Regions:
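Divalent metal-cofactor coordination and adjacent catalytic microenvironments
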Residues: 1-96
């Protein structure tokens, strides 16, 4: 896992018991990153970890898909980070 449940809850500032939803979002974010880059990353890769946290937070905050559009700023950051992970990442052990 790129991100633990506790890390994700702290990142999105959730005190309640939404563990099942957040765990599902973490798994979905990891799969999204894998499909976008074709690579599997470990927690040692800080860029991948941060991208996972961004995705989990965005999806959690916009999980109802009603109302405001998702932040365009977040979308731009996500696209940029995916490109960096896809083309600029070396072997996992080298990235700390």
């Amino acid at each position: 896992m790129l991100v633990t449940l506790e890390e994700a809850k702290e990142w999105i500032r959730v005190d309640g018991d939404d563990d099942q939803t957040i765990t599902m979002l973490i798994k979905a974010a990891e799969l999204y990153i894998y499909k976008a880059t074709g690579k599997t990353f470990t927690q040692a890769n800080e860029d991948a970890k941060l991208l996972c946290l961004f995705l989990v937070a965005d999806w959690y905050e916009n999980r109802l898909l009603v109302g405001e559009k998702a932040s365009e700023k977040i979308r731009t950051i996500v696209q940029s980070m995916i490109l960096q992970l896809q083309y600029a990442s070396g072997p996992q052990e080298e990235r700390k």
